[in-house]
């Protein structure tokens, strides 16, 4: 019935580009399980990922008292807070608020009360380690074959 309505509406507008069937991917995040990441206190639901480009859109759930270690953004990062709040040296972002990070910006992020955020990455973050070296890393799910440690990534 819905397909008939779409086809009928298209026929009424000559010159209109026809939609690509199967060109959209619909998800029900509420039915997806939270997966652990390599960062204690942070779990993830991946909504979209292009591993070749390094792009990712995901929900991240921060437990109260969580800190994401110092890292740099090689591309802009966009974040919308759905629940709770998180903060860094530049300010605090609360439920219903949005923040984006400039290319090359570095920060450590904290959440005292916990948070659920929608994050959009164009490239994986680069994490700085106390030993003074830098490795590219991205948020990954822990699996039996990948215990979730931060390691070099291609790209």
Predicted regions and their residues:
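Glycine- and acidic-residue-biased ligand/ion/polar-headgroup-sensing regions
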Residues: 63-66, 72-89, 95
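Short acidic-glycine-tyrosine-enriched beta hairpin
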Residues: 87-111
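Residue-level marker of beta-strand positions
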Residues: 67, 97-98, 116
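Ligand-binding loop in jelly-roll beta-barrel domains
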Residues: 103-130
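Conserved hydrophobic/aromatic beta-strand scaffold that supports enzyme active sites
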Residues: 44-46, 57-59, 78, 98-100, ...
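A short, N-terminal "cap"/entry segment at the start of jelly-roll beta-barrel domains
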Residues: 1-54, 135-155
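Short histidine-centered beta-strand/loop micro-motifs
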Residues: 48, 58-60, 69-73, 90-91, ...
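Short, charged/polar surface micro-motifs in flexible loops or helix N-caps
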Residues: 52-54, 63-67, 87, 105, ...
């Amino acid at each position: 019935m819905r397909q008939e309505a779409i086809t009928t509406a298209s026929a009424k507008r000559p010159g209109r580009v026809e939609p690509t069937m199967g060109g959209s991917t619909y998800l029900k995040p509420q039915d997806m399980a939270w997966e652990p990441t390599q960062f204690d206190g942070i779990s993830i639901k991946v909504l979209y990922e292009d591993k070749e480009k390094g792009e990712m859109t995901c929900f991240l759930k921060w437990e109260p008292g969580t800190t994401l270690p110092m890292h740099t953004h090689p591309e802009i990062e966009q974040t919308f807070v759905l629940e709770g709040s998180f903060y860094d040296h530049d300010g605090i972002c609360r439920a219903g608020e949005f923040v984006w990070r400039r290319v090359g910006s570095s920060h450590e992020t904290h959440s005292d009360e916990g948070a659920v955020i929608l994050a959009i990455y164009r490239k994986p973050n680069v994490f700085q380690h106390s030993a003074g070296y830098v490795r590219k890393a991205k948020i990954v799910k822990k699996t039996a074959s990948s215990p979730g440690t931060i390691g070099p990534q291609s790209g």
